[in-house]
Amino acid sequence: MNVLVTGGAGYIGSHTCVELLSSGYGVVVIDNLCNANPVSLERVETLTGKKVTFYEGDVRDEGLLRKIFAENDISCVIHFAGLKAVGESVEKPWEYYDNNLNTTLVLTKVMKEVGMKNIIFSSSATVYSADNEMPLKEESRTGGCTNPYGWTKYMTEQILSGISHADPDWSVVLLRYFNPIGAHKSGLMGEDPRGIPNNLMPYITQVAIGRREKLSIYGNDYPTHDGTGVRDYIHVVDLAKGHVAAVKYATGNKGTEVFNLGTGIGYSVLDMVNTFMEVNQVELPYQIVGRRAGDIAVCYADPAKSKEVLGWTAQETLADMCRDSWNWQSKNPQGYGE
């Protein structure tokens, strides 16, 4: 069975390719490489000893998608492709709506044409309203997003749910990720953001390796145990395995289902910093600065449904995530560029 992975050269996509290949699936990737490096796919092949069929191009290119479906017997699509920086989405809303919504519309149009109606969407905890009680369950309130990135995820969920509702032959699985960090234990693959990292862990590792002077912690006056923001951090390999479980589910069921992929445990920014320094025996200079607009105090998942329905549970600890992130960065100081 072949799986088409859009955005498959990216951080989560490439780790998912490893788990799919290791589970016996064939993998076809389309990626325009706007925020990814094709070296990641070479590493996927090295780790698995299996071939990835790669098409460089944009998911909004209908002709290319038709070619991919004509040349490969695809049974399921995992749709990662999209722009993903919250702050940038506020500055460039048009680009985010154009990219993140139109990729889905073009992709599902071609899928409908060829009669292949199984799709797993890379959604996000940003679809949940900020005023929910914790932990977040799949039925917690959605909408009321605080930035265009979150709205594109919310709108894409609505598009896919609507398609599935109108045509019962569709199988739609919406995976709401929490905060993916970590790297493959081999140290061959990890997160390699372009420019200044938007996420906490790559910033930490770049400070630790000497590429950046110090870490800025945004706010220490939140109503949490140490005043810093609390999030549900999940190891990227656990997250990737969740996608394999979702493929099995999507190819055996119809309709729309939503799953949280998180650990169910919240850790603060300072918990992360202190754990990273402790397990890796490195110093991490940091400064406390003002809060970032749009950040909430606490966000963590209730992953019970994923365990019950998908048979999936996150296995890796925060210490594992910190250790694997540093292993990747220390072996690849410039990411895939070296």
Locate each region found by the language model.
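Catalytic core of nucleotidyl cyclases, primarily class III adenylyl/guanylyl cyclases
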Residues: S186-L188
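Residue-level detector of secondary-structure boundary/capping sites
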Residues: G24, G150-W151, G195, T263, ...
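C-terminal substrate-binding subdomain of Rossmann-fold SDR/epimerase-dehydratase oxidoreductases
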Residues: L200-E338
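Short-chain dehydrogenase/reductase
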Residues: Y97, T146-Y154, G190, R194-N198, ...
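Short, basic/glycine-rich phosphate-binding loops at helix/coil junctions
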Residues: G182-H184, D221-Y222
